[in-house]
Every structure is written in structure tokens, then in C-alpha cells.
């Protein structure tokens, strides 16, 4: 499980870049130009396409918003109180297996990749929220264990 010490600006930036790439892949996979017409012969396929497109893009929007909140926190634009109060990552349902079955393997893999990405962020968020805000940072705790005084 992620600990508070594992969240830092570099990790958030890396995850943010990954989220942007994944979001762009989702956008291209679910671009509806021509896909709805092709699927219109089967209503169930059209419903599955619409539902999973909405679910997957919303999952990625929530992920990007969570990452933007953490970027703002590390840039000093949000306080820890604001981040804890308003920056929680929402729970999000996974794709329904029967709907996933109508997609080609590449689209299914993309949907599952967004689910895994969201689950990673959720673990990081939960680990960060479990930390006591008054507890010393990992560096301060290490210094204390080593008996080194902080420079100041």
C-alpha cells in the first residue's frame, strides 16, 4: 500500500503524463464518428458502446482532476486541508463483463487499463488519507531515528 512518503511531485507528474496519454487513447477509441452507425444494427452494441464510452471517459476525467488537485497542492495553490476535504478520488464502477464482451480486444484492454490506473490512484489516495496530518514527514522521522537535527 502507498504511504504518504510515496506521494511527491515527481510521482504526481509521472502519473499525470500517463493519465494524459491514456485519456487521449480513450478519446480516440471512443470517437463516435462512424461507430454508432455501424453499431445501429444492434441496439445492445450501441448501448454498450455508449455506456462504456461514458464510464471510461468519466473515470479518466476523475483521475486527471485528482492529479491536478495534487499538482496544485504541491505548487502551493491548495492547502492540505483543502486537498483532504475536496480532493478525494471517487469510487467508480468497473465495466460490466457482458458489455465488455462486445468490444474488440484492443478496446477491452484499454478499458481495463483505465480501471487499473484508477485503482492505482485510489490506493495512493487511501494511503495518503490514512496518514495523520500532524505526523512528522518521512524525512523528519528518519532524521529523528538517526539523531540528526534539522537545519534551520
Cite the ranges covered by each PLM segment.
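Surface-exposed peri-terminal alpha-helical interaction modules
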Residues: 1-152
